[in-house]
């Protein structure tokens, strides 16, 4: 039986937080909000507790977890050999949506790191998350609080749909702020390597680190062979409805015209294009002028698509600047790499 606890995200009630913290300390699982998406947490020092996360999510065990901390003392409990520059940067950017991959200490069990000698760590910028970690007295390992392959949850209702009856506690702390998962960067190598784009942008990373490596899998153009961090290797973020991603905006209208003749479609578009496609089902992602709004609505939109009873979702591409890079990473993966750059690409993915 899952206990659902509603907590004020701005002024978390300590008595309610303590209920969830007791569950963490006793080897249980708690879904909780962060500034990015909801996470499903367990004691990061308890391998058996962390296995419950994988079981609840149907998550492959070779897909590592992010360890969430509330202070720098906890950082040194889970990570070692941290470069001075990385420590300086962490003091600037934390709490915030940036995860570092570092060398792990012996205290971190293999269940958290998928047997690797590295650990992904971040300090979340959310009052409920920070208070939960503090009251638990241990770092909390947590991936997103959804069934594996499904869109990450940005509100408690989505967590309840996926995980009610599968976890001990779900904290309802309202809608998350960013709507996409944290940026992950591997700082055990030089230059650092971007493993997953997120709210902390490439432009911001370059200001802090100088040169960074951006592999193809970080762009969402292919899967990584080994998962050093979440979101690298497996199908992610996907609605159950087939999703096509039209990266070339110049042909979007033609693609929609072609597909809507044979299929029942829903369009995932910015509000600026809404009038142009009147008469077709639409999910408005936000405004072209505010990509943070688009990111915040992205996973909600994928879940909304599944409620519309259509054959296909057709999503338009967005500029890969700022958080747009993370939007396109998630969209490519959600589409199963069904990416349309020319009209001829349509025939690769759909029978016309």
From Swiss-Prot:
The cellular component terms of Gene Ontology attached to this UniProt record, alphabetical and capped at eight, are: cytoplasm
Q: Which InterPro entries match?
A: DHBP_synth_RibB-like_a/b_dom (IPR017945), Sua5-like_dom (IPR006070), Sua5/YwlC_C (IPR038385), Sua5_C (IPR005145), T(6)A37_SUA5 (IPR010923), TC-AMP_synthase_SUA5 (IPR050156)
UniProt: ATP binding residues: 59, 63, 118, 144, 152, 196, 237
| Pfam families xrefs | Sua5_C (PF03481), Sua5_yciO_yrdC (PF01300)
One GO-annotated biological process of the protein: tRNA processing
Catalytic activity entry: L-threonine + hydrogencarbonate + ATP = L-threonylcarbamoyladenylate + diphosphate + H2O
Keyword Transmembrane helix recorded: no
Keyword hit for tRNA processing: yes
Which keywords does the record carry? ATP-binding, Cytoplasm, Nucleotide-binding, Nucleotidyltransferase, Transferase, tRNA processing
Q: Which GO terms describe its molecular function?
A: ATP binding; double-stranded RNA binding; L-threonylcarbamoyladenylate synthase; tRNA binding
Q: What is its EC number?
A: 2.7.7.87
Q: Which family does it belong to?
A: Belongs to the SUA5 family.
Q: List the NCBIfam families.
A: L-threonylcarbamoyladenylate synthase (TIGR00057)
**What is the stated purpose of this protein?**
Required for the formation of a threonylcarbamoyl group on adenosine at position 37 (t(6)A37) in tRNAs that read codons beginning with adenine. Probably catalyzes the conversion of L-threonine, HCO(3)(-)/CO(2) and ATP to give threonylcarbamoyl-AMP (TC-AMP) as the acyladenylate intermediate, with the release of diphosphate. Shows ATP hydrolysis activity in vitro, producing AMP.
What quaternary structure, including any partners, is listed in this protein's UniProt entry? Monomer.
* Protein name as catalogued: Threonylcarbamoyl-AMP synthase
The organism is Sulfurisphaera tokodaii (strain DSM 16993 / JCM 10545 / NBRC 100140 / 7) (Sulfolobus tokodaii)
Organism lineage:
Archaea, Thermoproteota, Thermoprotei, Sulfolobales, Sulfolobaceae
